[in-house]
Regions:
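Acidic/His- and Gly-rich active-site-bordering loop/insert found
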Residues: 1-90, 95, 99, 106-115
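General structural feature for long, well-ordered alpha-helical segments within catalytic domains
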Residues: 3-10, 23, 27-34, 60, ...
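Divalent metal-coordination and catalytic microenvironments
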Residues: 14, 53, 64, 94, ...
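Active-site beta-loop-alpha junctions enriched in small/polar residues
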Residues: 19, 67-69, 126, 154, ...
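Histidine/acidic-residue-rich, glycine-tolerant segments that coordinate divalent metal ions
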Residues: 51-52, 71-73, 79-89, 96, ...
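Non-cysteine beta-strand/loop elements that form the S-adenosyl-L-methionine
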Residues: 63-65, 176, 332-338
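Metal-dependent amide/peptide-bond hydrolase catalytic core
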Residues: 201-373
Length: 373
């Protein structure tokens, strides 16, 4: 079996056996077995899921990171190696990322004697719930590390294309929940109640004006309501309704201004309708900010490796690789996966031809980065 065939085989085994965040027990066991069969050293961190391998010796240390968890999505690809776990799918390509870094680890192991330092390869759990990076950092995965690199497959780019940027790349992620409390009533006698559904509906509409009319159009911001829940029958106005959604920004100043304005609007609506609106915010990862030097370096190495390189657009998705970059410099990059369907879609099907070239790229990137720290 060729190197490429081996990586694709591993990817398909991971794809058939996806596991949700913090449940990646079998995934971790598979990765451990594959790494140990390749002679890799595993660091003795106290982790329930996920693991860290290391190649090389010396004081200089570079890290590579892959995420290993899947999503609660029922797969609809029809592939012969489709998910065997009902309602769970690698719909974000973390099986691809893991296979790439497994390949990079094996390539680095072959050149271990020539490496001018050490490379840590982080197989991180729980990216989808934004907790895994903190778990690895607490375990000590960044100890002595000077720079870190990671990737995401990009379905909108053809295979063989690469993009990154210095500075802000991915967004701040905030989740919000509004609990709108009015007064229940018979549907035929709405005047006897305070219609929480009507209030919630108007609130959804007005919230859109914050992003479109109160923020500079040059600033990136998305405010999306993604869930409305209230009532359980057709002839009763419910007492309460919940709204849930997300705010995405790149600037912390815009983030705080929008959050404050949303709370003001909620308070104003509550007063005007004689109702109560409680607003709860839950912080996800902060904006992912690439180190400009390392982003340029990663792009230069990609060009050497034969990729067609691009300056990436700003991305409003969330990515907890941002947490690593709050501690040490590094760069996150996009590598084309040419899928007709996008990330988190039940028919998402990335092109496996990206895996082996990306493995060679990250091995080359790590080795050259060691020479520049």
């Amino acid at each position: 079996m060729s190197f490429e065939q081996q990586l694709i085989s591993w990817r398909r085994e991971l794809h058939q056996n996806p596991e949700l965040s913090l449940q990646e027990v079998a995934t971790t066991a598979r990765i451990r077995d594959w790494l140990q069969s390749g002679g890799l050293t595993l660091l003795p961190f106290d982790l329930k899921t996920g693991l860290v391998a290391e190649v090389g010796s010396g004081d200089k240390v570079i890290a590579l990171r892959a995420d290993i968890d899947a999503l609660p999505i029922e797969e609809a690809t029809g592939l012969p190696y489709r998910s065997q776990n009902e309602g769970v799918m690698h719909a974000c390509g973390h099986d691809i990322h893991t296979s790439v870094m497994l390949g990079a680890a094996l390539l680095l192991k072959e050149r271990e004697a020539e490496l001018p330092g050490r490379v840590g390869i982080l197989f991180q759990p729980a990216e989808e719930n934004f907790g895994g990076a903190k778990t690895l950092i607490r375990a000590g995965a960044l100890e002595d590390v000077s720079a870190i690199f990671g990737m995401h497959n990009e379905p909108g780019l053809p295979v063989g294309e690469f993009a990154t940027r210095g500075g802000a790349f991915y967004a701040n992620v905030d989740r919000f929940v509004f609990k709108v409390t009015g007064k229940g009533a018979h549907a035929a006698r709405p005047h006897e109640g305070k219609d929480a559904i009507l209030l919630a509906s108007q609130l959804v509409t007005v919230l859109q004006s914050v992003a479109s009319r109160e923020v500079n159009t040059l600033d990136s911001v998305v405010l999306s309501v993604t869930r409305i829940q209230g009532g359980n029958t057709w002839n009763v106005l419910p007492e309460s309704v919940e709204l849930e959604g997300t705010l995405r920004t790149h600037s912390s100043e815009v983030q705080q201004r929008v959050k404050a304005r949303v709370s003001e609007i909620a308070a104003g609506f509550a007063s005007a309708f004689g109702a109560q609106i409680d607003v709860f915010w839950y912080a996800g990862p902060t904006a992912l900010v690439n180190d400009a030097r390392w982003a340029d370096f990663a792009s230069d190495v990609a060009a050497q490796a034969g990729y067609r390189t691009h300056h990436a657009d700003l991305h409003l998705g969330g990515e907890d690789f941002a947490v690593y970059l709050q501690h040490i410099p590094g760069a996150f990059v996009s590598i084309g996966s040419a899928s007709e369907y996008g990330l988190h879609h039940p028919a998402f099907n990335p092109d496996e031809r990206l895996i082996a070239p990306a493995a060679h790229y990250f091995a080359q990137l790590a080795e050259q980065a060691l020479q520049h720290i």
